[in-house]
Amino acid sequence: MILNMLKGKIHRATVTQADLNYMGSITIDKTLIDAAGILENEKVQIVDNNNGARLETYVIPGKRDSGIICLNGAAARLVQPGDEIIIIAYAQIIESEAKTYKPKVVFVNDDNTIKEITNYEFNE
C-alpha cells in the first residue's frame, strides 16, 4: 500500500508579499525550502493560520536568506502580507517505509529566519 505522508513543512512563516498579477505559485526563500527538503516546482499545500484558508500551488525558489514568502496569482486573494502560514509538502511512501519515515519540520522566527529544524513533531 502507498500512503500520502508529510514529507516536510515550514511552520508559521510570515507572508511578506502577495502578487495578484503573477502567473501563480508561491515564492519561498531558498534557504527555507532546502531546509524542509522541498523542491522547486513541487506541489505544496498552504494553510493560513489567520483566516483558515487552504490552497495548493507549486514552489518557486526565492533569493537565499531573503525571508521572502510571496503568494502569487489567485492565491494572493486568499493570503495577505503579514499572515502566518504553514507550507506543507507530502510524499507517497510505501507503508513499510512510512512507519519509520521522519519528515523535516522547519520552525521559523517572525522574520522567516530558521529557528529550529527537526525530523519529527512532538506534541505533549
From Swiss-Prot:
Q: One Pfam family this chain carries?
A: Asp_decarbox
Q: InterPro entries annotated for this entry?
A: Asp_de-COase-like_dom_sf, Asp_decarbox
Keywords, A to Z, come to: Autocatalytic cleavage, Cytoplasm, Decarboxylase, Lyase, Pantothenate biosynthesis, Pyruvate, Schiff base, Zymogen
List Pyruvic acid (Ser) occurrences by residue: 25
Q: A Gene Ontology biological process annotation?
A: alanine biosynthetic process
Task: Tell me the Gene3D superfamilies matching this sequence.
Answer: 2.40.40.20
Where does the source fall among the domains of life?
Answer: Bacteria
State the EC number(s): 4.1.1.11
Q: Does the keyword Transmembrane helix apply?
A: no
So which cofactors does this thing need?
pyruvate
Q: In which pathway does it act?
A: Cofactor biosynthesis; (R)-pantothenate biosynthesis; beta-alanine from L-aspartate: step 1/1
Give the co-factor note: Binds 1 pyruvoyl group covalently per subunit.
Give the main localization category.
Answer: cytoplasm
Active-site residues, as the UniProt record annotates them: 25 (schiff-base intermediate with substrate), 58 (proton donor)
Alphabetical GO CC annotations of the entry are: cytosol
Give the free-text PTM comment from the record: Is synthesized initially as an inactive proenzyme, which is activated by self-cleavage at a specific serine bond to produce a beta-subunit with a hydroxyl group at its C-terminus and an alpha-subunit with a pyruvoyl group at its N-terminus.
The cellular location(s) given in this protein's UniProt record come to: Cytoplasm
Job of this protein: Catalyzes the pyruvoyl-dependent decarboxylation of aspartate to produce beta-alanine.
Under the subunit heading, UniProt states:
Heterooctamer of four alpha and four beta subunits.
Record's family? Belongs to the PanD family.
Protein name stated in the entry = Aspartate 1-decarboxylase
Per the UniProt record, the lineage of the source organism begins with: Bacteria, Bacillati, Bacillota, Clostridia, Eubacteriales
